[in-house]
Amino acid sequence: MTKKLRRGYTTGTCAQAATKAAVTMLLGNVSVDQVTVSLPGKEVLTLKIAEAQKEFNKYNKSNPEIESVSCAVRKDSGDDPDITNGILVYSKVSRIKSGIVLDGGIGVGRVTKPGLDQPVGNAAINTVPRQMIVKEVSEVCHLFDFQGGIKVVISVPEGENLAAQTFNPRLGIKGGISILGTSGIVEPMSDKALLDTIAVELKQKRAEGHSIVAISPGNYGLEFMKRTYGYDLERSVKCSNFIGQTIDMVKELGFSKMLLTGHIGKLIK
């Protein structure tokens, strides 16, 4: 009997839960050991808070006010072989005059090339996690009838070291990992995750103005192109075994030409 693989939750869900806990502690002056969050796919998760720390206003010793709160949630990727499994995702929140300001801190990448989910200069916190985080802040502010604003900074202390093992440097995301997730759940051994990455790379090449793209199942074809023809690998995309799906994406994105290269045995398999 085949073992059912265990699902996990995304870095976006970790950031969402850590933010909810931190804002609750900031505005409610309470301790929080765990939080329950609703995910975009309507699932509900209860996650433990791995770390929590309050910082007080040191200039008001007679009646110290909480200046900021930092909470962390530990990432659980389930049975998916994800390098981010077990890392701590932190959210530090503080009061501001108005609005909700969200940014990335240590270990969260910064976008340096066009064509990605976020504009150049933004922290690599994708749209859905941003929405999840802002939703939690808004709801907690409403709960405590807080009329001011909140600043949220998401950090991943291990993020900069881990980023070298991801697609981020190739995509132009510098300094850390991305805060990701569309459903909030990590599906183990997901083909969709790899297809999504291929789509992001192709969209980026198109946004940079390239009309011709080289694709290859792996390193063999790309190294051949570089060694034999001096081809710029910044204009290429690895497609693994998803050659057909990648060709469909190339067509949909409006590239005028595509070059497919690879080991003959791999291509005809």
Functional labels for PLM-detected ranges:
Residues 1-165, 169-171:
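Generic N-terminal targeting/processing segments that precede catalytic cores or assembly contacts
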Residues 6, 171, 177, 182-269:
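A structural signal for small-residue-enriched, beta-sheet-centric alpha/beta enzyme cores
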